[in-house]
Amino acid sequence: MNDLAGLQALVEDVGSGNVIDAELLDGCPVEAHELDEMDASQAAQVAAHCFGLLFDHKVEQLQGLEEDLDAGLWTGTVDGFGFQIRRDDVGDLVLDFSSQQA
């Protein structure tokens, strides 16, 4: 999908609350057992992989900005879209994208 407006609309519509599960991680360079200890760069790789699957878009620029292992929180950007990976109340990692940079 090359239409930026269409991509932004998709991100706003279905970009929040994506649980990172085995199916979503399939083919990702970061494996499931590495998620709890990943650094910001690895979080960006996970976000870019998931972004590509969810939105049928090849990510060209990714950047991990912050990680807080104690809080279970990682942030960064993929192709100008902000991302946040957070641990929810039941222990799942949830990926949220936003149309504005994190």
What are these regions (language model features)?
Residues 1-5, 94, 98-102:
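Short intrinsically disordered terminal tails
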Residues 16, 25, 51, 64, ...:
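Intrinsic disorder/low-complexity segments
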